[in-house]
Amino acid sequence: LLHLRWQKVIVGALLLGQAILFSANAQTSSYYRKHLEHYDDKPVHYGFLFALPVTRFGIVHSNTFLTQDTLNRITAPATAGFRMGFVVNGYLNDSWDIRTTPSVSLYDRRVQYEYAKGSTRNELREATWIEIPVLFKYKSQRRMNTRMYMLGGMTFGFETNVRKRLRQGSDFLNTRGSDLTVDYGFGLEQFLAYTKFSPEIRFSHGILNLFRSNDLNTASNGIRRLTSHTVTIYLMFE
């Protein structure tokens, strides 16, 4: 699982590095036009985004799991989702911006139970979430048409299909319908002729316990705490 998660992160880092190399090579030419030269004079900018989140549950086992002898492992493999939304960026000063990226995310989080007799059971949590982050962005100095940045903040999210999930059956894995995460990441701003393109990698770690006990689901009795962990590759246009 750890190998799979880091493989996704490495792929994203390589894509971002490739964009940086492309920008650096372009600036070595003898003539280079500075696009959107007065971009920072406008206090607020709007845009849209597409993103690929790779997400999983972080599991803390309960005392029941430690004392029983029928269940060997409970794991949460990383799975890919999809996200799209809007960008609202407010200028604070030459170094700092405040940003929000309200978005709709489609997640397929999975919990896998491995039993002592060799059998396995998978529970898939398909969910649609609306997520609203508040982020502070620290910007480097602009070098012609390129600028690096780091950002951090928090995101509040809530699930929109809770009733549908509850109708699926009372013996399913039960989780909370809201979450709060700590977010941080880095990205590259590339100023083009008519827009600004920003690839970004962002890490999110949930601080709320999403698990709700369910006596009808005996396998989940081995879980005490579930938290969300997500690595997301963003493509933003402003």
PLM regions: where:
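Short glycine/proline- and aromatic-enriched beta-strand/turn motifs that initiate or cap beta-hairpins
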Residues: 25-78, 238
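Outer-membrane beta-barrel channels and translocator barrels
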Residues: 41, 93, 141-145, 191-193, ...
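Residues that define the transmembrane beta-barrel architecture of outer-membrane proteins
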Residues: 42-44, 78-82, 126-130, 146, ...
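Transmembrane beta-strands of outer-membrane beta-barrel proteins
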Residues: 44-50, 98-102, 130-132, 148-154, ...
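Transmembrane beta-strands of outer-membrane beta-barrel pores
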Residues: 52-56, 104-108, 140, 154-160, ...
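Repeated loop/turn-to-beta-strand initiation elements of outer-membrane beta-barrel proteins
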Residues: 56, 95-98, 144, 194-197
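Outer-membrane beta-barrel translocator domains and adjoining extracellular loop/strand segments
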Residues: 59-65, 111-118, 161-169, 210-217
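Predominantly the C-terminal beta-signal and adjacent terminal strand-loop region
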Residues: 177-179, 184-238
